[in-house]
Regions:
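Short nucleic-acid-contacting surface segments enriched for D/E, G, S/T with interspersed K/R
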Residues: 120-133
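Residues immediately within or flanking Cys/His clusters that coordinate Zn2+
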Residues: 43-46, 59-60
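Short, conserved beta-turn/loop elements at beta-strand boundaries and strand-helix junctions
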Residues: 85-90, 138
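Conserved hydrophobic positions within beta-strands
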Residues: 80-83, 118
């Protein structure tokens, strides 16, 4: 990032101009590694469009509602409502031992939406259920690290728990 334009882009600041490709590096919260690094530090970060207030998870460099590139990063609440959910019976190999499991699209209290596994049986969940995001260690959850891509090995696992 250039020091005069976006030096504080990772800390809840409004940018002075649209993000450019040179403003993004591997540590930026606008990348998946940066998003998961923040999550590992107990921060759930979303990009928030300064033109239309749309919150995007994981963060994006441009708003997918209005197309603006004027975005900032902000911490998000961990609680939300189940908008949609399904039961996965044939997951990717890293999650094979967990099947069947429930996955949901959750609208957080801020309006941002995030998809994740829910620590509840499919039949126990319903649209409108209140859940809260927790961060867990993938190995402790039974995820095979050999099935992860090399850059994903240290990423924490986000899971929603019913409240």
């Amino acid at each position: 990032m250039t020091e005069d334009d976006h030096s504080d882009a990772t800390d809840d600041a409004t940018l002075t101009g649209p993000l450019a490709p040179d403003d993004i590096d591997a540590e930026s919260p606008f990348t998946l590694p940066g998003f998961f690094d923040a999550l590992d530090d107990d921060r759930l970060l979303a990009a928030v469009c300064t033109d239309c207030d749309n919150a995007m998870l994981p963060p994006r460099t441009a708003c997918y509602d209005c197309g603006s590139r004027a975005v900032t990063v902000a911490d998000q609440p961990r609680s939300g409502i189940v908008e949609s959910y399904t039961e996965v019976h044939r997951p990717p190999s890293a999650f094979a031992d967990l099947a069947p499991f429930t996955v949901a699209v959750v609208e957080l209290d801020s309006g941002a939406r995030l998809t994740g596994r829910v620590d509840a049986d499919y039949d126990a969940l319903e649209i409108g259920s209140t859940v809260e995001l927790v961060v867990r260690d993938p190995v402790a959850e039974g995820i095979d690290p050999a099935a992860a891509l090399s850059y994903e090995e240290d990423w924490p696992l986000h899971v929603f728990e019913p409240v």
